[in-house]
Amino acid sequence: MSKVDSTSTKRAKIRKRKRWERFDGYRLKNIPSFQKLIPFTMKRRSASLNYFEITYDAGEILKYLDGKNRNLEENFDPNNPIKQYTYTQFFMTLIVRMFALRPRLNRFVSRKNIYQRHNIEIAYVLKKDFSDDGEESTTVDTFERDSNIDDVGYILHDSIKSVKETTDDKSGDFVDTLMKLPNFIITFVTWIFDVLIYIGYCPAVLRKIDTMQSSVMFANLGSIGLEGTPHHHLYDRGTCSIFISVGRIRKQKYLGENGVEERDVVDFKITMDERIADGFYFVKSFELLKEILDNPQQLDDRLKEVPIDE
C-alpha cells in the first residue's frame, strides 16, 4: 500500500502527457509480448469479457459513513459543499483509489495496441427525478489519482448540482438535434466521431458527453433500491474497459459462533476487458478492494505516491 498524507496540500507526482500522444492515453511498451499479441487474436471488446460477482461485508462502510456524517453535523460549516457523505461518493472514491493503486485497470485497447489512460475518468448516469419518464443526463467526471473522499465529493457535488439545477442539457440538446437529421447524415456523423476516437483525436464536445470514453462506467443501483445487481456488458465502441455495478446494502444470514447471525453485505458485479491485464492482476485488485472496504478510514487521506504504468 502506498503511503498516505492527511495534511499536505501537495499532490502526488503524475506522468505528464506528451504532445504527440492520444487525447485519452499513451501507448504502453513495457508489457509481455504475449499480451501484446492478444488484441490481434481477440479483436472485439465484447468477445473479451470476464464477469466477476463478489459479495463483501459492508459493516465497516456503515460505521465509517455514520461517523463521517455525525462529524459533519457536529462541525457544521456552511461553506462546505459536502452536506452528507453518501454511498455513491464512497464507492466512487473506492474506485478512484483502486484504479490509482492498480493502474493496469485503467488501460484500454485501441488499434490493437494497449494504452494507459492519462486520467481516472468515471462515467455515470444522473436522473433529475426518480420516475419512468425522469430526465437522464450522462456524465463523465475526471479525478486525480491521489484523491481522497472529500476531493471526490467536491467534484460530485458540482456535477450533480449542475445537472439538477440547469435546464440546458448540452448532451441532450446535441443528441436531439442529431436525431432530427436524415439517417445517412447520422451514420456519417457517428462514423466521423468513431474515426476520431480510433486515431486518438476526439473533439472536446464529445469527450464531455460520451460515457464510452472513460476508465469505468459505474452504476450505484442501490440508489434506486435495487438489491440484486445485474451484469452489464461493455461496448465495442469507445475505450471503456470496466463496468462496475453495486447493489443496495442488504442483510445476509450466515452461520456464526452463536448460531445463525446476520451481517450487512454489498454485492459488486464487475465486467472487465481481459485484454488489459491477466487474471492474477484482477484477483489481487479485488483483494485490495476488500482491504479498503475493511479499512475505509484510509480514504480520508490523499495518496502520497501513486504507481505509474509504463
Question: What does each model-found stretch correspond to?
Answer:
Residues S2-E310:
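C-terminal catalytic/motor cores of large multi-domain enzyme assemblies
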